């Protein structure tokens, strides 16, 4: 039956299987590295092409790039406030990487590329990527608070009353968990649902679900960047 369905090989779902590289004695998750490098390369090439011939009156790729930059600046200013300027590169990198990663899961035919074990997919459909992004964000807001207030930053754990110390500490540790699992769960679920639908019904039928996945991927990148900005702004303001 599988041999009669030409789409089966493309949409087969392999969960829990991984392809590893051995580098300097350490096993690294090759699938995530390959797809992440693809996303990074796409962003670098896109930015280079759009900005290689800057004009006083922007047009084409430069116009789009400036629109994205303005959007990220507004996002950072809304969440962080008057100190947002130096955090624009970080929030912009987060947003663009997650956005392109999410969309690559639906638009790039990763499953046509065969690996010895496992399969390729969106980088954000792997928990290793989302946890890394969440830990980077945790490091960023701790850095923001410590550079502005020194060790006095930790006094926030005693507010409004020292009784809440354990809960306040737990809150900071749950932030990266919620960030990583929310993004991972949404992207992985979308990929699995689309793959199963394609294996069961003709290719045209799952298109609405794929479009919904693109919309959800864009929303998830916005949510992640917005929450990252909110956490950094909270660390700077102290409330």
Swiss-Prot record:
For whether the record's keyword set contains Zinc, the answer is no
Q: Does the keyword Transmembrane apply?
A: yes
Q: Name one Pfam family in it.
A: ATP-synt_A
The GO terms describing molecular function are: proton-transporting ATP synthase activity, rotational mechanism
Q: What is the lineage of its organism?
A: Eukaryota, Viridiplantae, Chlorophyta, Nephroselmidophyceae, Nephroselmidales
InterPro entries, per database record: ATP_syn_F0_a_bact/chloroplast (IPR045082), ATP_synth_F0_asu (IPR000568), ATP_synth_F0_asu_AS (IPR023011), F0_ATP_A_sf (IPR035908)
Native organism = Nephroselmis olivacea
Q: Where are the transmembrane segments?
A: 30-50, 88-108, 127-147, 192-212, 213-233
Query: Per UniProt, what is the name of the gene that codes for the protein in this document?
Result: atpI
Q: Please give the name of this protein.
A: ATP synthase subunit a, chloroplastic
Q: How does it sit in the membrane?
A: Multi-pass membrane protein
């Amino acid at each position: 039956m599988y041999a009669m369905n030409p789409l089966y090989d493309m949409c087969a779902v392999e969960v829990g299987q991984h392809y590893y590289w051995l580098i300097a004695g350490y096993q690294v998750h090759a699938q995530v590295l390959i797809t992440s490098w693809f996303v990074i390369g796409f962003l670098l090439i896109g930015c280079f092409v759009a900005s290689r011939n800057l004009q006083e009156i922007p047009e084409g790729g430069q116009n789009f790039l400036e629109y994205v930059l303005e959007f990220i600046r507004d996002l950072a200013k809304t969440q962080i406030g008057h100190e947002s300027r130096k955090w624009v590169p970080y929030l912009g990198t987060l947003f663009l990487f997650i956005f392109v990663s999410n969309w690559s899961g639906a638009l790039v035919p990763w499953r046509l590329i065969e690996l010895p074990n496992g399969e390729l997919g969106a980088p954000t459909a792997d928990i290793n990527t989302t946890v890394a992004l969440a830990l980077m964000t945790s490091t960023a807001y701790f850095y923001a608070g410590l550079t502005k207030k020194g060790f006095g930053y930790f006094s926030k754990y005693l507010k409004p009353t020292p009784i809440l110390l354990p809960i306040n500490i737990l809150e900071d540790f749950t932030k990266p968990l919620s960030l990583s699992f929310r993004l991972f769960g949404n992207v992985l679920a979308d990929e699995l649902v689309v793959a199963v639908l394609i294996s069961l019904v003709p290719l045209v039928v799952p298109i609405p679900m794929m479009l919904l996945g693109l919309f959800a991927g864009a929303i998830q990148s916005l949510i992640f960047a917005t929450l990252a900005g909110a956490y950094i702004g909270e660390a700077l303001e102290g409330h």
